């Protein structure tokens, strides 16, 4: 456990390796920004928790490996995750919830389910990057509004699921698509 707070930015270097582990939540407070330029690993029983009022931001330009079923979520305020690097859920067989993701890099799901939610289900997120879902894994767009623009791609033999989000899909084919709830406007590029 532990936390970062205040109104500044905590930046990790390109050659750094940052392991967020242990049994306690990893808290973000106030309006803090965490910028990862190196390698960040999230493992352990609990995830990242954006707590109290204010807008919290995680910018990932490096690699972020989620090796747990724990969530990256919020309570009060907002949480935005901007991924222009590589974000992977590589371990765990259950669901990891990721709130507030905008992807212009690469998101890979190789184990379990990565569920994309938004703050209170009302946020709007644009994706111009790649999503790759491995065999037996699931990428679940669960809430809020997600726009997959023409530059984005969804690949892999795993399942892509729309389970409650409002989707605007402007990309090529989506392999293994399951729609269980929500709204989807599909305008294949």
Where are these regions (language model features)?
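Extracellular beta-strand-rich, repetitive "passenger/adhesive" scaffolds
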Residues: 1-189
């Amino acid at each position: 456990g532990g936390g970062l707070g205040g109104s500044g930015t905590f930046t990790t270097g390109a050659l750094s390796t940052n392991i967020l582990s242990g049994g306690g939540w990893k808290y973000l407070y106030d309006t803090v920004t965490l910028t990862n330029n190196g390698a960040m690993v999230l493992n352990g029983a609990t995830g990242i928790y954006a707590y109290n009022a204010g807008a919290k931001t995680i910018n990932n330009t490096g690699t972020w490996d989620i090796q747990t079923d724990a969530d990256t979520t919020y309570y009060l305020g907002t949480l935005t995750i901007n991924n222009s690097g590589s974000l992977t859920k590589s371990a765990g067989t259950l669901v990891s919830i990721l709130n507030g993701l905008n992807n212009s890099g690469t998101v890979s799901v190789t184990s379990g389910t990565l569920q994309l939610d938004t703050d209170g289900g009302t946020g709007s997120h644009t994706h111009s990057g790649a999503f790759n879902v491995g065999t037996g894994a699931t990428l679940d767009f669960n809430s809020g509004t997600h726009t997959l623009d023409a530059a984005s791609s969804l690949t892999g033999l795993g399942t892509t699921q729309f389970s409650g989000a409002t989707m605007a899909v402007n990309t090529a084919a989506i392999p293994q698509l399951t729609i269980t709830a929500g709204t989807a406007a599909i305008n294949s590029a």
